[in-house]
Amino acid sequence: RFKALFFKPRNAKKHLALKDVSLKINQGESIGIIGDNGAGKSTMLKMITGVTFPTEGRVDVRGKVAALLELTAGFSLEMTGRENIYLKGYILGLKDHYIAQIEDDIIEFAQLGDYIDQPVRTYSSGMKMRLGFAINVNIDPDILVIDEALSVGDKSFKKKCKNKIAEIIKSGKTVLYVSHSMDGVREICPRAIYLKKGKVVFDGDVNEALALYSSDKK
């Protein structure tokens, strides 16, 4: 839930990234967040994940949040992929026994082969992103926040990612999805929030939201 939300970046004189945003998102909803660059989409997601806090107002979040934002954030380049699974788990507040339970699922999903026991500094950027994605979608989050993360990997891995997201949605979890792919938003989300210059200009049916957004861009 967002209540009278404002956010002003440091050193900003007049610019507000978000202006008087009030929203309620229910458990189990899948919601697309659309808008041009600079509309406030990423700022909103960062507030939900606790990375950023509002200048005024408050954000109430219930449950465990997994964020597919900066997928490689928190990785140690000198540690192996396997060790980074635990490191990332600790950062997310998970216990050893729980990380051990999901370790094999993460490794299988990431498809890194023997590289899982090699230092992450030897990974390509795509391999790091796959590992980050695999960790976040396998921790059984109550709320999954996605910012263009479905563009990770090749065609086969993208399909695998989409199937996993569909599985999470089917299980009754809440999904917030930011994307510039209108088809992607329509496929995943029945509801969409259209942000424009930090304000919510539409909140409702995804097709209406996308039609309004497309019309504004003409």
Where in the sequence are the language-model features?
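Pre-NBD coupling/linker segments of ABC/ABC-like ATPases
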Residues: 1-19, 206-218
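Conserved ABC ATPase "signature" region
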Residues: 1-5, 86, 98-115
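A short, surface-exposed alpha-helical micro-motif characterized by mixed small hydrophobic
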Residues: 185-187
